[in-house]
Amino acid sequence: MVEIANAHNDLIHDAVLDYYGKKLATCSSDKTIKIFEVEGESHKLVDTLVGHEGPVWRVDWAHPKFGTILASCSYDGKVIIWKEENDRWSQIAVHAVHTASVNSVQWAPHEYGALLLAASSDGKVSVVEFKENGTATPLIFDAHAIGVNAASWAPATVEGGNNPGEAPKEVRRFVTGGADNLVKIWRYNPETQSYLVEDTLEGHSDWVRDVAWSPSVLLRSYIASVSQDRTCNIWTQEDNTGPWVKTQLTPEEFPDVLWRASWSLSGNILAISGGDNKVTLWKENLNGKWESAGEVNQ
């Protein structure tokens, strides 16, 4: 475990390792992003990225096939794309289509290209496609009327292609969580070149603070949603087409607001953090029941 002490002058909101686990990006209410090189349990600060005018909520690394690229989102309503070349970091794009805080940012599975998903307190979600010629094409649309707190891509999947002469079709989906207490599943329609609501999931009685789609590419899909109401729901769907089934984790385990949910790389362990300053781990047993798998020692 790498411990970063006194790196920022205010609260740290996110910390993400790159694809290889060699670089760590952190972001803070001090309006900066810090880049560290990580080796074993040691780390070295290599750069401080300055460009946002408000607290920076989240950061996300692009797949290395696109280069050493990082996206950040902030209370200032902007998403900034940063790139490292020759050991120097610089801004290469600013995505400023939102009119309020951008609360979540995530790159799509690399199979879809350089697609970036952003969620904002203005009630809208945007998906930006960055093309090789340097242009960017944004789609922006209403998602949750009171505000969107989080968004998460589904892993890359295809459907069809089972019959002779039939090509498999790419399935692009993501999930959003909002201040309207709802979780929504979105699916890309290539004919209209737009994202449409596929399902609306009701299961929380207060703001949905985070959503996380498991990266597992099994036939069953898993989504975790955590809320201001102190609950975590696991939503499951069989084979991309069936109804979503809700399982609520043991409620007495969570004495305070839940802020974040994060899956392991294999998609079988879920980490949840909340207002009690604990990170708890959860795993599905062979009987399909979710049980505690311990805590992360701080």
Curated annotation (Swiss-Prot):
It is found in: Cytoplasmic vesicle, COPII-coated vesicle membrane; Endoplasmic reticulum membrane; Nucleus, Nuclear pore complex. The keyword Endoplasmic reticulum applies. Gene3D superfamilies: YVTN repeat-like/Quinoprotein amine dehydrogenase (2.130.10.10). Keywords: Cytoplasmic vesicle, Endoplasmic reticulum, ER-Golgi transport, Membrane, mRNA transport, Nuclear pore complex, Nucleus, Protein transport, Repeat, Translocation, Transport, WD repeat. Pfam families: WD40. The keyword Transport applies. InterPro entries: Sec13/Seh1_fam (IPR037363), WD40/YVTN_repeat-like_dom_sf (IPR015943), WD40_repeat_dom_sf (IPR036322), WD40_rpt (IPR001680). Its main location: membrane. WD repeats lie at residues 7-46, 51-92, 97-138, 143-196, 203-245, 253-292. It comes from the Eukaryota. GO terms for molecular function: structural molecule activity. It is a peripheral membrane protein. GO terms for cellular component: COPII vesicle coat; endoplasmic reticulum membrane; nuclear pore outer ring; Seh1-associated complex. GO terms for biological process: COPII-coated vesicle budding; ERAD pathway; mRNA transport; nuclear pore localization; positive regulation of DNA-templated transcription; positive regulation of ER to Golgi vesicle-mediated transport; positive regulation of protein exit from endoplasmic reticulum; positive regulation of TORC1 signaling. The COPII coat is composed of at least 5 proteins: the SEC23/24 complex, the SEC13/31 complex, and the protein SAR1. Component of the nuclear pore complex (NPC). NPC constitutes the exclusive means of nucleocytoplasmic transport. NPCs allow the passive diffusion of ions and small molecules and the active, nuclear transport receptor-mediated bidirectional transport of macromolecules such as proteins, RNAs, ribonucleoparticles (RNPs), and ribosomal subunits across the nuclear envelope. Due to its 8-fold rotational symmetry, all subunits are present with 8 copies or multiples thereof. Belongs to the WD repeat SEC13 family. Component of the coat protein complex II (COPII) which promotes the formation of transport vesicles from the endoplasmic reticulum (ER). The coat has two main functions, the physical deformation of the endoplasmic reticulum membrane into vesicles and the selection of cargo molecules. It also functions as a component of the nuclear pore complex (NPC). NPC components, collectively referred to as nucleoporins (NUPs), can play the role of both NPC structural components and of docking or interaction partners for transiently associated nuclear transport factors. This is Protein transport protein SEC13-1. It comes from Candida glabrata (strain ATCC 2001 / BCRC 20586 / JCM 3761 / NBRC 0622 / NRRL Y-65 / CBS 138) (Yeast).
